[in-house]
Amino acid sequence: SMGPRAGEEPDLLLRDFYAASALPAGDYSAARSFMTEEAAGDWDPDQQVLIVDSLDIITDAEADSTEGGRSFNVRGSVIGTLSEGGSYSSENGDFEAQIHMTQVDGEWRISDLPQVVVIERTELRNRYQPHSLFFYEHTGQALESDRRWLSTGQESLDTELITLLLQGPAEELAPATMSVVPREANFGGIEDGVYHFTGMSDMSQEDRTRFAAELVWTLSTAGIPGPYQVVADDAPLVEGLDEL
């Protein structure tokens, strides 16, 4: 895991903190390990992640006089954002923040920071991977791909992809797609290699077949090998098909 190194200088510690911010596992536990206990408990970052080209870290000497702490101004050009579901949107803007650090048992820790996750473009490329979700376009004739950036440190990629599939397409894609899955549909997990769903008993055979296609395309494109055994409400998702 990525945590602070003993005796690390505050500016280098801050660099490592921003590298650790590209690891969302455990509600950003790696990034929180660079903060004081109080700051880590109070940090409730916005769901939207900011992507910057690179970060400049400048010592703020004027603010440094306070009780032996250190202050830094952090700046970068915002190039995009990642939604909670991993949808990337291009943006143009500036990120600017002041970070305060203090010593805890002789080690520098971040004591004050903005409520936002900021990662550099290179960290996005190193720590995230683009995957495609597939949804039917509104006529129900063809599949549309919906690109998502997902953290490569995830335990089970298939579970994450299926969860996102049930949540539906990205906002800008939604009007052009058809919804084949009812709101009450739920993914119950994978048991002995079988994908279990509930809340699908009211779906037509046509919609079941469409959801099966969305699922197969999403999993196979992500490199998850088939065939897939898919059960909905204790029966095969598509009647007569034990495997997709």
Labelled PLM ranges:
Residues 1-244:
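Bimodal "functional hotspot" detector
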